[in-house]
């Protein structure tokens, strides 16, 4: 992540809608001015407990969201994909799915980790659905795990482990192939259906 390269386009992407509703389940509210947004990005860039990345539209080169690798436990080979903050445009873009695939590929194939976690607010339907779509298995709920924005949050836990990864990887690669999309950019087969074909 680079503030010099990405700050302006990220600010524009997050403010393409009039309100911060997409930030409802994020740990903070949407920064409403450029100074506050700059400070927010600096906290991500200089985080001691996570490495944050920018998701960039490969065709236009615009930064459209951020995501982090966090809770990094090198000794036990465990890592988490978290702080996923997609702009509205990225939610309708194959680049968002590709970004998650690339992080999983990095965690399992490059770093050799054994387990990759995904955690989210139990009320966050989009994040829970995304976890299932990407192939993370539901492992349970931690009730009243934290207090966020003045309320109790129950946290749902999901994970992919190393023995799951080959099948999930094959499905991601098949889904991302150009042949899986028609001339309008609509998918022909869903990611979860491709996993079913290869299982």
Where would I find each of the regions flagged by the language model?
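GNAT-family acyltransferases
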Residues: 1-93, 106, 110, 151-156, ...
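Flexible ATP-lid and adjacent glycine-rich G1/G2 motifs of the Bergerat
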Residues: 103
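Conserved beta-strand-loop-alpha-helix junction that forms the acyl-donor binding cleft
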Residues: 118-128
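Conserved catalytic-core motifs of GNAT/GCN5-like acyltransferases
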Residues: 137-151
């Amino acid at each position: 992540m680079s503030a010099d390269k990405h700050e302006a386009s990220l600010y524009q992407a997050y403010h393409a809608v009039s309100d911060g509703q997409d930030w409802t389940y994020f740990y903070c509210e949407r920064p409403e001015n450029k100074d506050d947004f700059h400070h927010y990005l600096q906290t991500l860039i200089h985080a001691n407990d996570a490495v944050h990345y920018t998701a960039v539209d490969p065709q236009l080169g615009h930064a459209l969201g951020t995501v982090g690798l966090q809770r990094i436990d090198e000794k036990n080979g465990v890592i988490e994909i978290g702080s996923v903050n997609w702009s509205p445009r990225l939610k309708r873009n194959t680049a968002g799915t590709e970004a998650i695939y690339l992080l999983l590929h990095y965690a399992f194939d490059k770093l050799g980790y054994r387990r990759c976690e995904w955690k989210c607010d139990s009320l966050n339907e989009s994040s829970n659905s995304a976890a299932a779509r990407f192939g993370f298995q539901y492992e349970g709920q931690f009730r009243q795990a934290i207090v966020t924005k003045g309320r109790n949050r129950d946290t749902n836990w999901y994970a992919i482990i190393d023995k799951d990864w080959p099948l999930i990887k094959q499905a991601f690669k098949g889904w991302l192939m150009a042949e899986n999309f028609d001339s309008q950019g609509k998918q022909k087969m869903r990611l979860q259906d491709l996993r079913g074909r290869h299982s």
